[in-house]
């Protein structure tokens, strides 16, 4: 394993000399070759060298990063503007840990269109995860109610697929009959034509309603000229629907031709709330919200990072000719050049002083301050809950990392466990873990929650048992864990472990921890479901507490999240087993071919709907086997084929 460059002065100096003085991007990696940070500069060598001159001028976050740098790479570009575009793409595609400014704030929803699919789906989601580079997220939207109403009306105005999967294997459903769906499930509409419909829908969520009206008006006139009055009437209905869609956009500007985005930020020492108002043709068509880590960052830099991240993920037509910002950006001219290049037309980035534009900034800033106030209130509640939990469990300091565990199964079958983690009172989903119960004594028809929970504790903490056996100071490990939890996640020692269950589950867990010699090092409790009672090891009675206490509420949220996560995983395992067992009934399909089929088609529904030719294209499936699989799911087709062959023989 490589050592950090800071520990190798000669190698560091040589590496810095190798970096050119031209514009470009630099990439910093750690000992495991993980990308820590991507940056850009007009002069690469000077910029990279600045990280290693003096740590006093660096923020705590960047100082932590510099201590981990083991390798530095660079990519030379022709200009600083080109470096900015490259940096934006690298950050978007690789998400380096120390570049991620915007928080994954689940309260803001997005609209997703899966352009990568032959018949794209359109849905609301709070998880911004790209399954394909072609898929697009629109948002994040502040008002989820308005977003739902808009999507509901869009599905009334335009014929769109209404279901993620077909309702019937070989015929359309009622939605097709009443004109709500173009018959996607039976391919009544071509993929190209359906994409054309979706492109019109996307214009609504891009704030291009006026442009869409012009397009539809032209189509309606063409249909009328051809005397195709039925199609013209359908377009007329769509135009009326678009008028209804934009009825909620009441805020407007005096100049109806103006299109601009307006950004403002409100921040404290640790957190920033950013608002982006989208004005198109003089109307407010979208309000997007972002949350950011504001530690040691100037407001102008936060706004610049938001602009870089947001506009790197939108289509060129969504970039307006004017972007107003509350504060001067560190590289405002460069950002304007980059946006102009993206849009292929001039874009101005302005820090306005005159009244009308400054009033717009003030309006957006007030909304940002409101969001910051809500975030502070939430943080205060979380801090109070942690303090109350510390008092309940008699801890010296409020816990930062707490872990919750639960078991899920049906009479021992498909037994699984969940580990969920809250950090500073909030779910930290990157630290969640799922376990399949491995004990041979827990199987269908025989369950043992105590044994299952003990197994999970052994698997979770056996590495820490080895650390302790090697003579490590676990008190020091705890301190390191608390100081770096939110920075790099390197340490995963919990301040509190909570078990879903009563005294029995807690006793089994403590016995397992005693085997690991960690029973005195971990703070463990259990939360029983019926009376929300909290049990501690060795205590005969539950803790005295009130159900509405903040600390109890925190444990209850942790317990409910562990239960949800365990049940979801159990259902997945059970569903996969049932799929495998159903396919295993088909002659010629062994376990490997079943796995290959499911990997190729993704679901048993897709296998059931596949034609013989499509099945034949799957790995390891010959023509004869493809016919057998098709016949298994559609025996009536086989009967019809046999009857046809019999008729030919008689003839």
UniProtKB/Swiss-Prot annotation:
Biological source species: Synechococcus sp. (strain CC9311)
Localization in the cell: Cytoplasm
Function: The UvrABC repair system catalyzes the recognition and processing of DNA lesions. UvrC both incises the 5' and 3' sides of the lesion. The N-terminal half is responsible for the 3' incision and the C-terminal half is responsible for the 5' incision.
PROSITE patterns in alphabetical order: GIY_YIG, UVR, UVRC
Subunit structure: Interacts with UvrB in an incision complex.
Gene Ontology molecular-function annotations: DNA binding; excinuclease ABC activity
UniProtKB keywords: Cytoplasm, DNA damage, DNA excision, DNA repair, Excision nuclease, SOS response
Superkingdom of origin: Bacteria
Protein family according to the UniProt entry: Belongs to the UvrC family.
Single biological process term from Gene Ontology: SOS response
Gene responsible for this protein: uvrC
Domain UVR: 210-245
Domain GIY-YIG: 21-100
Matching InterPro entries: GIY-YIG_endonuc, GIY-YIG_endonuc_sf, GIY-YIG_UvrC_Cho, Hlx-hairpin-Hlx_DNA-bd_motif, RuvA_2-like, UVR_dom, UVR_dom_sf, UvrABC_protein_C
Cystines in this chain: none
GO cellular component, one term: excinuclease repair complex
Keyword Cytoplasm assigned: yes
Pfam families, per database record: GIY-YIG, HHH_5, UVR, UvrC_RNaseH, UvrC_RNaseH_dom
Taxon lineage: Bacteria, Bacillati, Cyanobacteriota, Cyanophyceae, Synechococcales
Name of the protein this chain belongs to: UvrABC system protein C
